[in-house]
């Protein structure tokens, strides 16, 4: 191996020297040709026909010599950079045509497993055979396989296994040259629409059809508390009881109570019960510096007017009048 490398090194040096010599000769010939053409073009008087013919012959010879030198350089450059080993003798081919051509290898169906194929139905007129493409070399997390997608919609999977086909519905027709949305994008758009619907439903004025309206299921809106407008007032307490709070224009229902750190009085939480589904809330606590005063904090806005108090619970009809007996 060392001897072969040394011989290859000497051969490369010789080839480089030969390339340099041929390139230098070609450049000299080009320089001579340019000089000859410049002398011919700058002659003041018209040359004789014999002299003009001689100049044309000289230019042709110089051009041929220059071109041959550069061709030699190109051929030398094409020979460099290849393998160091020489080609072996060509084996004589037999006369029989059957012996020269290798017989195709055929394997039994049981030896080679058939690939799984997915056959899609043909797309609409907007998607023809012009949309054919091929995908190869896809690697999965557990194993790598090759798949190809042809223009007619058939997907070939390189994994071993039985042959199966799956018929899928055609893609929806598009307008204005826009491609159809993928399944993931369609799911995201549907989720965004549902989220918008839930948001509008949560803030609608009239909520009908149960706790979650007519959406056909539980609301998937975010449970995070939204920023609400707060308004705090101080009113005098009407009694020493915690449950007694001064009345206002709306009806309230207590739904919770929480102790306050540093105060012996708890804080009561109320929601508006004037109209079903109203988001207005308030919490009432005693002033720790002046127990005779109450601090009332309102959150949210009412979705109704104070006159709607009797709409949800209509008053009972008056009793029938008793007619005097004759």
Curated annotation (Swiss-Prot):
GO MF annotation: an example: promoter-specific chromatin binding
Main location as per UniProt: nucleus
Tissues where this protein is expressed: Highly expressed in aleurone cells. In seeds, predominantly present in the plumule, radicle and scutellum of the embryo.
DNA-binding region per Swiss-Prot/TrEMBL record: 241-307
One protein family per Pfam: WRKY
A cellular component annotation (GO) from this entry: nucleus
Positions with biased composition (Low complexity): 97-113
Region annotation (Disordered) ranges: 87-113, 204-225, 297-326
Induction details: Induced by abscisic acid (ABA) in aleurone cells. Accumulates in response to uniconazole, a gibberellic acid (GA) biosynthesis inhibitor. Repressed by GA.
GO annotation terms (biological process): negative regulation of gibberellic acid mediated signaling pathway; response to abscisic acid; response to gibberellin
Top-level lineage group: Eukaryota
Signal peptide: none
Domain notes: The WRKY domain is required to bind DNA.
Family affiliation: Belongs to the WRKY group II-a family.
PANTHER family: WRKY TRANSCRIPTION FACTOR 21-RELATED (PTHR31282)
Name of this chain's protein: WRKY transcription factor WRKY51
Organism field: Oryza sativa subsp. japonica (Rice)
Gene: WRKY51
């Amino acid at each position: 191996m060392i001897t072969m490398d040394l011989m290859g090194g000497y051969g490369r040096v010789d080839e480089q020297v030969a390339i340099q010599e041929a390139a230098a000769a070609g450049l000299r010939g080009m320089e001579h040709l340019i000089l000859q053409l410049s002398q011919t073009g700058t002659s003041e008087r018209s040359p004789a026909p014999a002299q003009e013919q001689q100049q044309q012959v000289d230019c042709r010879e110089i051009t041929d010599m220059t071109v041959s030198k550069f061709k030699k350089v190109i051929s030398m450059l094409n020979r460099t950079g290849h393998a160091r080993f020489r080609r072996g003798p060509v084996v004589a081919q037999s006369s029989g045509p059957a012996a020269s051509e290798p017989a195709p290898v055929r394997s039994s169906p049981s030896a080679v497993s058939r690939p799984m194929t997915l056959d899609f139905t043909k797309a609409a007129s907007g998607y023809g055979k012009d949309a054919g493409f091929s995908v190869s070399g896809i690697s999965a997390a557990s194993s790598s396989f090759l798949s190809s997608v042809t223009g007619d919609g058939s997907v070939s999977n390189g994994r071993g296994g039985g042959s199966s086909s799956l018929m899928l519905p055609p893609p929806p027709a598009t307008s204005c040259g826009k491609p159809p949305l993928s399944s993931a994008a369609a799911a995201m758009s549907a989720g965004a629409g549902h989220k918008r619907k839930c948001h509008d439903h949560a803030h609608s004025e009239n909520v009908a059809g149960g706790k979650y309206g007519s959406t056909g299921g539980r609301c998937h809106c975010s449970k995070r508390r939204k920023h609400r407008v707060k308004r705090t007032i101080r009113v005098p307490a009407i009694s020493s009881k915690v449950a007694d709070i001064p009345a206002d224009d709306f009806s309230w229902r207590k739904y919770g109570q929480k102790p306050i750190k540093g105060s012996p009085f708890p804080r009561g939480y109320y929601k508006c019960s004037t109209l079903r589904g109203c988001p207005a809330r308030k919490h009432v606590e005693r002033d720790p510096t002046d127990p005779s005063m109450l601090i009332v904090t309102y959150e949210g806005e009412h979705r109704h007017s104070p006159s709607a108090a009797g709409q949800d619970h209509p008053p009972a009809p008056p009793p029938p009048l008793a007619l005097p007996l004759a």
